[in-house]
A protein has these predicted regions:
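Conserved core of the sugar-phosphate nucleotidyltransferase
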Residues: 1-68
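Residues that scaffold the ATP/ADP-binding catalytic core of kinase and kinase-like folds
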Residues: 31, 77-78, 134
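Glycine-rich loop/turn
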Residues: 49-56, 103-118
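Conserved nucleotide-sugar donor-binding
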Residues: 64-78
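Conserved active-site and cofactor/substrate-binding residues in soluble primary-metabolism enzymes
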Residues: 69, 73, 93-100, 129
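A C-terminal functional module that forms or caps the active site or interfaces directly
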Residues: 78-110
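Small/polar glycine-rich anion-binding or flexible loop at a beta-alpha turn
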Residues: 91-98, 117-125
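Hydrophobic helical membrane-anchoring modules
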Residues: 112, 119-153
Length: 153
């Protein structure tokens, strides 16, 4: 799994979901899918799932952005591969929280996950207001040669 710094993965425009990780000697020991992480203008980052009692989060915490290297034949993934095609409308928009499954397997002793660290800044469009920031970041990556002039091949 690629581990990002929490501070490098949050939006200025609203809450995000991240798998907050606990590590031991470079291995993932626990991952908690945290659904309402909020960054404040002063740099504080909190878990706001319970608004009456926000929980401070360490900006340097390692989080999962769902970059997992799992074998294609990984038997434990079968429930995800075999979702019924006739899902109800509310289920069609449901999110499959892979960190929840991974955490269960780690806890049961059926999975070991090495963590590769990155200091890269994650950017994505979670909110419409994120779009200009992402466009500028992509433009900068093209201009500095990180990305080729065209990604079309």
């Amino acid at each position: 799994m690629v581990g990002y710094r929490l501070k490098n993965t949050v939006s200025d425009n609203g809450t995000v979901s991240r798998g907050v990780c606990q590590l031991d000697s470079g291995s993932l020991r626990k991952v908690k899918e945290t659904l309402k992480i909020k960054k404040y203008p002063d740099g504080r980052i909190t878990d706001t799932e319970n608004p009456a009692q926000e929980v401070p989060l360490d900006p340097e915490s390692v989080v999962s952005m769902n970059f997992w290297g799992l074998p294609l034949d990984f038997e434990e993934m079968r429930p995800i591969h075999h979702l019924p095609p006739e899902l109800a409308p509310e289920e069609q928009k449901a999110e499959c929280l892979l960190p929840v499954l991974v955490d269960r397997l780690i806890t049961a002793g059926r999975l070991d996950v090495a963590v590769l660290h990155t200091d890269a800044v994650w950017f994505g469009v979670t909110y419409q207001e994120d779009r200009p920031v992402v466009e500028q970041a992509l433009k900068a990556l093209h201009e500095n040669g990180t990305y080729p002039p065209s990604l079309k091949g």
